[in-house]
Structures are given as C-alpha cells and as structure tokens.
Amino acid sequence: QDFNRQRAFCLKQGLLFEDATFPAHVKSIGPNLLPEDQLRQIQWKRPIELQKNPYLIMDGVSRFDIIQGYQLGDCWLLAALGSLTLQKQFLAKVLPKDQGFQDDYAGIFHFRFWQYGDWVDVVIDDRLPFLNGRYLSVHPRTSNEFWPSLLEKAYAKLRGSYQNLHGGYLSDALVDLTGGVQVQLSLKDPPPDLEEILTAADKSQCLMGCSTTGQWRKNIELKNGIVQGHAYTVTGTVKIRYKNGWQHIIRLWNPWGHGEWNGPWSDNSPQWDHVEPKCREALLRNKDDGEFWMSCENFQEQFSWLYICNDTP
C-alpha cells in the first residue's frame, strides 16, 4: 500500500480511508484475545469521532503519553516504545512527520518498522477498537493525542492481529523499532561491571529495557510495587552524592503509566533526604506516573533480564 497515493485518492474523492487488509473486524483482533460475547461487542471508532480536536502528537512525544490498555498484554512493545521516545534519532524513522489530523486528513496513517533487514512502511486506517466504551489497547494519557494508539495498531497489523501482541519479547520490539543490534544480560548472573555498562549505554543513547520473572498473564504486583512477568523501560542512570559517598541509581518506567517501586530511592523514600536539594529537584518527579528510581543492588534483585539496543554493535 502506497501511503501518499492512497491519501491523495481519498482526499480527491472526499473519503475516509478504510483498510481492507486490516479491517475494522474481529479478525484483526484475533479469535482468542477475548471471550466470544465480548468480541461481538467491539466497536471501532476514529479519533475524530472521539475528540473535537484530535492530534497525532501534542507537545512532542514522551513515554508519559502511553498508558497500557486493560485487555492487551503488550508491555514488551510499550516498554520498547517508552525507550524509543527518549531517542529522537530512532523515533523519526518509525513515526513519519508527513501526517496528522489537521492538514490533508483522510483517516490514513503510516509507521515504519524494521523487518528482515529493511524498513517496512505499514499503512493503516485510524479506526480503533473499543470495548464497553474503553480502549481495548494502549490509550493516550492526554485524551486527544493518538500517536501511541495508532502506532500500536500498525504494529498489530505487521504482526497479523492485536492478539499477536499479547505476550512477546522486549528484545524483538527493540530491534523492530530501531533496526539495531540488541544484547541481553542476565541480572541473576550479572557482569561485574554492570554499573559501567549501564552508564556507557545511557551515554551512548542506547535503548534499554528490563523484565521480571513470573507469569505475565497474571499481572501480580508485589508488596514492593514491582509487577511480575512484566517489562519496564530503563530511562536513565546516574551517580549521585549520598551521605559521605556516592550512590548509583537507575530510573525505570512501567508501561501501565502508574504502579511504582516503593522501596529505597522510590518517590517518598527517606534516602532522598540525604541528597543535595538541587540534585533532588533535578531528579525526582513525585507523581504516580509509573516512573521511579532504585539502587543498582535492588535492580539486580528485582529484575531478571536487561536488554540494551543500539544501531551499531
């Protein structure tokens, strides 16, 4: 499908694009994602039906734009996406700027993913699935910003259905969004220079994510706030003055858009009382937005795998 040709045709005819290759139909959802009675209740709506002034992007692209949907277990994709938003050089390849709801809107969008050694352009219409008035999949934190929902739909089309996003590998998503090379490190048997590896990867603008063990379908949240069988984005790492020495801390983000670690170095932990106020102000966002800090030791205890991806080895 040629995006420019299809859009020009729709604009000329005064039509909104309807994608016959990934239709607003139950087969695009997949047969086993939901019970049959719920599948029958799915409605498809365009952003222009949901909002008076929809935007593809508002005030730039950020991980905080993303909130994982309540029916789709695609944290592995969204954790990779959260990392992608931090690296604008990769983002520009995936999310072309020649589209939106303001100029030349025809209900058609396109996104690019890396597949088998090449960038593939995936064209979609903008009809999104709803169940009982709620987004079936990812939904925007700002009600009229739609890039997360539309990008996820394009990736679902690439994979054959939304159901095929239900459980997957963070390592695959990182490569599909960058065309890069990824490395997996076991945190149960970590390299002795893990802190240096994290610092170097952060400095080199690598994409980073991590995962916990456990059954991902169950979404079990431990008392300490960490979710089992779940993927997170590593969004930063820093060494700070703490008491009389130095402390290496790591910042992580949960694709749920809420639900955070509540141990040492979490938003309200007493450790921050021993950090210079200027440094604390620069690093700490005391909000339930899914992002939190933790020590390198706790990171190794709580997570099982670290994934690092860059466009060069």
Regions found by a protein language model. Give the residues of each.
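Structured alpha-helical subdomains that flank or immediately precede key functional sites
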Residues: Q1-P313
